[in-house]
Amino acid sequence: MTWPENEEENLLYMRTDGEIARSKESSCVLLKKGNYCQLDTYFNSMSTGKWKKYTNVENLLVDVSIKGRGVIRVCFLERVDIKQVLWESEWSGNGELKELPCKISIPDNGMLYLEFEASEDYTEFRNFTFSTNIEKRREIKLSAVICTYKREQDIQRTLTAVIEEIYQNAASPLREKLRIFVSDNGKTLPPSEVPQIQIEKNKNLGGAGGFTRGIMESLKNTEFPATHIVLMDDDAIIRPHILERTWCFLSLLKEKFSQHTIAGALLNQKFPYIQFESGAQWNQGKVKILKNQLDLRKQ
């Protein structure tokens, strides 16, 4: 489960009439009796069509952490007006992450998500996970390449987030599976004190030259033979959980899609609930962005 960093982003992560309590140490939704927390949102739902088409995942396990008591529902939204409740039960907990007694077959195109309704006051909804016990996994190691030119604050923001949420987080699956290579075209960044992050001073050869340098540094690193390289803009706000989901998705890919490339969507930095693009078309020098100006707060 992922959490908003500010109130403006709440509807990208959850819909609730409770109170969102967010901190670095722990987060939860504080609920009174009858309050709800609904996760049919951009960041906390699962796009079943993509996972079913491209990965070997067929069934899902669901783990939930609550403190208190309430009703949990596993729901599937085929379209805005077509909703199915796949599993429902009264559930209580002491805050520990516990597996629900259900096994969900991944439906076709649509959105899989959880709903929770508190049955008593002072109930906390803390966390949930979708997982699979599939044995066939690909061994994936990611190199993230960032090209930058005199954007010290932007690059430091990204590196700090990765350090805190991945490298210093024992629970992160990427902790030993990610290396970062920064092409410093402005030659203004100090060397990294974190061994997993490599800063390379580079001639100002633009984005193409900077990304190429980062790719070259990754390929010649024999101590960390990366299977995939992720190209990241220096001024983009990167949420580390996106890198974790990318790693998970790649590790479960079907063999026939093993050479495919993943393209990420881009949100508006000033208005983070507006999608700037999700893919683009190139035609003789003209670029047409796709799925522009979508309000991602809507269901």
Feature-to-residue mapping (PLM):
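A recurrent flexible, glycine/aromatic-enriched loop bordering the glycosyltransferase active site
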Residues: N292-Q299
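Conserved donor nucleotide-binding strand/loop of the catalytic core
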Residues: S192-G209, E217
